[in-house]
């Protein structure tokens, strides 16, 4: 009897596998399949002529890693709006609107952290301090505690590094903004563009505790520190309250190949292979055509998605988006003379 049962189970598994369509991650067929499903989002081409190794390396977050203690939230009496956009709530903080580019490096774990940290420094100093915190400094100097540099890392450890060691300033590639701007160039997602090709190769840059020529103060003097770091529970309301009170947070989720094709709407996984874990910055929420969403900033340049941003289903821990949220509070005492 058990042999018959085992045979039936095998047949069901095979039938289910065959019923799932299989597409190349960047194919017209996958775009058409998603769009014909009449789901809550629209697919289109964001990448052309790029290596699969590059696409998988974009997803450089190790999910399920160590987490700092949760911060106790008191949200019972907090009245949260139906929609919220940190760009509109704190318009005097320019980094909230910014989209960065991680290039050919699995550094999303570092970008999600420094983007949210930059936003929070501005928010918690009432816009008296506006700084682009350096992804380069975090990526190169956190070492094995944070993971493996361009080969992936842990978002929670990025925030811990900020509180323990501090992070210097640093803008985009060749921006010459701050102490340590990003040293990895953006790569070309399109066929006839001017940027270098996207590959899945490249070593993590070396940690340098010297600011670029012409910048002052010194590396040590330029450090920005966190007062604390913590994880946020996977409660939808707790995450909303954290963003509402303190600013954008870092989150992470499982990326499937259909996500690479996101153009607009509220993303929900339809089909496609698992690419890896990916860290991002969550800056708000809302409802679109009856579908609740998180508003999220990616780090794949402004020519990806909706000018670099995307929306993803909210309230159902879709692809794990609500399970890996981390944040922290800046040490504002270091800015007293500016405030």
UniProtKB/Swiss-Prot annotation:
- S-S pairs: 93-122, 105-150, 141-207, 142-146, 179-211, 187-198
Question: Subunit details for this protein?
Answer: Dimer of a heavy chain and a light chain cross-linked by a disulfide bond. Interacts with SRPX2. Directly interacts with SHKBP1.
What disease is linked with this protein in Swiss-Prot or TrEMBL? Keratolytic winter erythema: An autosomal dominant genodermatosis characterized by recurrent episodes of palmoplantar erythema and epidermal peeling presenting seasonal variation. KWE manifests during childhood. Skin lesions may spread to the dorsum of hands and feet and to the interdigital spaces. Lower legs, knees and thighs may also be involved. A less common finding is a slowly migratory, annular erythema that is seen mostly on the extremities. Between flares, the skin can appear unremarkable. Itching can occur, and hyperhidrosis, associated with a pungent odor, is invariably present.
For this UniProt record, the keywords arranged alphabetically read as follows: Acetylation, Cell membrane, Disulfide bond, Glycoprotein, Hydrolase, Lysosome, Membrane, Protease, Secreted, Signal, Thiol protease, Zymogen
In terms of one coarse class, where is the protein primarily found? other
Family note:
Belongs to the peptidase C1 family.
Domain of life according to the entry: Eukaryota
Residues crossing the lipid bilayer are none
Residue list for modification N6-acetyllysine: 220
* Single annotated GO MF: cysteine-type peptidase activity
Task: Mark which residues the record calls propeptide.
Answer: 18-79, 334-339
Residues with an annotated glycan are 192
Q: Which GO terms describe its cellular component?
A: apical plasma membrane; collagen-containing extracellular matrix; endolysosome lumen; external side of plasma membrane; extracellular exosome; extracellular region; extracellular space; ficolin-1-rich granule lumen
- What is the organism of origin for this protein? Homo sapiens
| Range of residues in the leader sequence | 1-17
Q: Which residues form the active site?
A: 108, 278, 298
Topology with respect to the bilayer: Peripheral membrane protein
Q: In which tissues is it expressed?
A: Expressed in the stratum spinosum of the epidermis. Weak expression is detected in the stratum granulosum.
Name the UniProt record assigns to this protein = Cathepsin B
* Activity regulation (UniProt): Inhibited by leupeptin.
